[in-house]
Swiss-Prot record:
Name of the protein in its database record: Type VI secretion system sheath protein TssC1
Disruption phenotype: Deletion mutant shows a clear reduction in E. coli killing and a lack of ability to secrete Hcp1, VgrG1a as well as Tse3.
Organism: Pseudomonas aeruginosa (strain ATCC 15692 / DSM 22644 / CIP 104116 / JCM 14847 / LMG 12228 / 1C / PRS 101 / PAO1)
Its biological purpose: Core component of the H1 type VI (H1-T6SS) secretion system that plays a role in the release of toxins targeting both eukaryotic and prokaryotic species. Forms the sheath of the structure by assembling into tubules together with TssB1 resulting in the stacking of cogwheel-like structures showing predominantly a 12-fold symmetry. The sheath contracts to provide the energy needed for effector delivery.
InterPro entries named in the record: T6SS_TssC-like (IPR010269), TssC1_C (IPR044032), TssC1_N (IPR044031)
Domain-level remarks: The C-terminal region is required for cogwheel and tubule formation.
């Protein structure tokens, strides 16, 4: 017992000596001018040492090593506390929003023609505001006035080309109602609304479960999706685009990934568990593609495909050790989606972001809107419905609508007969028609999005000076798929004909 007391006493004396040495170093640095300030420094050092060395022993009598051990203990405690903060759901949601916006702004080359405006409004606030103006008063809501009347509805205004919502939607009645109201506003202002789908839209807890269902289409045939199906069949739903899944916003913090200068922080991330990673809404990635296409070509037509504007490059690539001793890479898009599943998702109105295996590259293969294209007895009518439900074609049509309203507004009051107006509009629209679509390059087709166009102007009976106009626009078709048949033959078909 006496020996134990002697050891404790010796350890206490050593601790006091090390604390005094550390205090003397700080006194030389701070140089307190009063005795009270000197005592404050010594008290702070003593308290710090007691907390840091609680339930521990000094490494040696070396003051430097003792200080390093104190710092290491503090770093460990700070790491545990910061991990709890950063992995809290509220903090993750906040970081996701800022990281996504940062990604959009940093990857967009803005100028006087391409601008980004941010409206800070939460999803519940947006729904609450629009819900007050349902029915015939939908165009009286402050959201409609802010987005439509202040720009597209104003002389000299600059209409929005696209709306991006950092939200996640599913088949719940409030979400279906909100999407329906946003579809009305987007259709009126001719600006598609791009947001994201939640995994709960398919009854999943996360996108990690996407490969489990055998048939995705069957999920949407149940009674609880009645409102969702009705929304997809509406005319205005073609202005809604829902992306999925999320993409990795940053690498985890750590000495080997993204060092923190302030202290030795190691972010705790389980490679197999996606909940501790920082994810961003993939609607931002689609928005970057839309902005890039507009910047390069003046039109938002090249926004999909690996080689035609749909690529998402430079995603964070995080590798981690596996249980079997190997090294694996965290999928930067939550889950790898197969070609067959991508086709199913596009058929059901989603825009999946596909990751290229073992790379930092992903791409939007399709750009299908939420709308389910109608099927008619006339094949041409069905083909027109399919075109109208795809965003690259819709963006071009919306841009023409923006220009036409400004053009007609400027012509009001001038002396224009029907034939003269039709001829003038026809000449104007031909500026955006590719003269030789069969031999034009991809760049030329992107700059001239139409393969053919025709304008018809008709007089309104009983109302002189008023005309009805119809624009028939035939865009360049984009490759949707190719069925390949391989056959071994003794002679080629061309050789037989010869």
């Amino acid at each position: 017992m006496a020996e134990l007391s002697t050891e404790n006493l010796a350890q206490g004396q050593t601790t006091t000596e090390q604390t005094s040495e550390f205090a003397s170093l700080l006194l030389q640095e701070f140089k307190p001018k009063t005795e009270r300030a000197r005592e404050a420094v010594e008290t702070a050092v003593r308290t710090l040492a007691e907390h840091a060395l609680e339930q521990t022993s000094l490494i040696s009598n070396d003051a430097i090593k003792s200080i390093e051990s104190i710092i290491a203990a503090l770093d460990a405690k700070l790491t545990a506390q910061v991990n709890l903060i950063m992995h809290h759901a509220d903090f993750q949601q906040l970081e996701s929003a800022w990281r996504g916006l940062h990604y959009l702004v940093n990857n967009t080359e803005t100028d006087e023609q391409l601008k980004i405006r941010v409206l800070n409004i939460s999803k519940p606030e947006l729904h609450k505001t629009l819900k007050k103006f349902k029915g015939t008063t939908w165009d009286q809501s402050p959201i409609f006035k802010k987005l439509y009347e202040e720009e597209y509805g104003q002389f000299g205004g600059e209409p929005y080309g696209c709306l991006v919502g950092d939200y996640y939607f599913d088949q719940s009645p409030p979400d279906v109602e909100l999407l329906g109201e946003m579809a009305k506003i987007s259709a009126a202002m001719h600006a598609p609304f791009i947001s994201a789908a939640s995994p709960t839209v398919m009854g999943m807890g996360s996108w990690q479960e996407l490969s489990n269902p055998r048939d995705l289409t069957k999920i949407f045939t149940t009674p609880e999706y009645a409102g969702w199906r009705s929304l997809r069949e509406s005319e205005d739903s073609r202005y809604i685009g829902l992306t999925m899944p999320r993409f990795l916003a940053r690498l985890p913090y750590g000495a080997k990934t993204d060092p923190v200068e302030e202290f030795a922080f190691e972010e705790e991330t389980d490679g197999a568990d996606s909940s501790k990673y920082a994810w961003a809404n993939s609607a931002y990635a689609m928005a970057v593609n839309i902005n890039r296409s507009f910047k390069l070509y003046g039109w938002c037509s090249r926004i999909r495909g690996v080689e035609s504007g749909g690529e998402v490059q430079g995603l964070p690539a995080h590798t981690f050790p596996t249980d079997d001793g190997g090294v694996d890479m965290k999928c930067p898009t939550e889950i790898a989606i197969s070609d067959r599943r991508e086709a199913e998702l596009a058929k059901n109105g989603f825009m999946p972001l596909l990751h290229k295996k073992n790379t930092d590259f992903a791409a939007f293969i399709g750009a299908q809107s939420l709308q389910k294209p109608a099927e008619y007895d006339d094949p041409d009518a069905t083909a027109n419905a399919n075109l109208a439900a795809r965003l690259p074609y819709l963006f071009a049509t919306c841009r023409f609508a923006h220009y036409l309203k400004c053009i007609v507004r400027d012509k009001i009051g001038s002396f224009k007969e029907k034939d003269e107006m039709q001829r003038w509009l026809q000449d104007w629209i031909l500026n955006y028609v590719d003269g030789d679509p069969a031999h034009s390059t991809e760049t030329t087709k992107a700059q001239h999005p139409l393969a053919a166009a025709e304008v018809v102007v008709e007089e309104v009976e009983g109302n002189p000076g008023y005309y009805n106009s119809k624009f028939f626009l035939r865009p360049h078709y984009q490759l949707e798929g190719l069925t390949v048949s391989l056959r071994l033959v003794s002679k080629l078909p061309s050789a037989k004909e010869a």
